Amino acid sequence: MSAVNSEATTNLLAEFQKLRGETIGLHSIFSEKSTVDISNLNGNTTLKRIEDSCEELKNEIREHVQVSSDELKSIRTANSGFLNKIEESLKTSQQEAREDLKAIEKKNESLLNKSLNELKFQKEQLKYVEATLISQQKLIEHMAKELTGKSISDMVKNNEDDGTHFEFSHTFNSVATLEKGVERRSELKEGCGSLNWFMSIKRERPSRKLLVYLNLDCEKLPTNNWIIEADIQCTLNQYYFNEWVRKFERKEDAIFKCENGEYTDKLVFNFGEYEEILRTFTKNGVWNIEFDVDIIKTVGLSKKKLRCFDESAAEVSDAVMIVKDEKFHVSKMFLAAQSSNFKLLFKNSNNSEFTLDGINSEDFQCFLELLYGEPALTGRLLNN
């Protein structure tokens, strides 16, 4: 409807402009004729007729202009009503949009407040957990100092041999007089629990090789089946300017194992000819060798206990904790002071024996050793 009204208005305006132009032309002609003396003209009747025609034309133009003006007013009135409807519709749409926007803002504000409250609650929980951990750490540190006179950090520093990594070296004398087929051994080195390790050298026969061995002391080996996987580095040191200097290194992946109580494995390093080693690495027949042992995995071997909680501790204990059929003799008062869980457990029961589920005996042994001030926290355990 808007397009039809616009087109009609345009047509009327164009016709009006055309009539206006014609009227201006006629007025111009009449202006020129007005300067001529009518008395000098012949044919007064003709002139009169022209004047009458012009007058009629003027009247027609006036009527036409009046009609066009009325139609234009009608169109304007119709357009005004249409524009009012559009304006009202626009106002209604704007109002609805504002209401929708307010509803969305209110909903988002509610969600934001809920999220902020949840974050605040989580932050408070985190602060509580952090404060609890700090409190427990201080308590354990205090207990460690009370029992051992050392802080936990000092115990970790002093506990370089954590059972999973150890180093040892040995200096062999009179290597130049070593006979073929004879094996010369070092002192024992304890590592990986209660196992004893040693190194040895042997001049092979009939070849001219000098071999270096890393081995386990068979006299103290467990008789059950077990396996040790390790990364081992052997270093030959050279005597240089009155000191031994690391000169030649070799690394090997090794597996030591015992099957049915029989141990036969040992690691062998072949560094070359006997005479070449004497020339390069010995000083007056003295030869220094180092081993760096990193235990990767053990199966069938238990960690060396730093404190006993067996029957020998029963006299100074008033409770027995049973973990996987293994009994640990402990003090109720001591454990209750370290843990609210133990405190609640002992408070709600008059029993002297308690069974703990969901934990293995080795982990509980380590836990008790830590509480009793033993250096159970090693560098590797802290990293894990």
Swiss-Prot record:
Transmembrane parts of this sequence: none
Domain named MATH: residues: 167-277
Keyword RNA-binding attributed: no
A Pfam match: BTB
Signal peptide: none
InterPro entries hit by this protein: BTB-MATH_domain_protein, BTB/POZ_dom, MATH/TRAF_dom, SKP1/BTB/POZ_sf
Keyword Protease tagged: no
Coiled-coil parts of chain: 41-127
Keywords for the protein's UniProt record, in alphabetical order: Coiled coil
Location of the BTB domain: 317-380
Protein name: BTB and MATH domain-containing protein 34
Organism: Caenorhabditis elegans
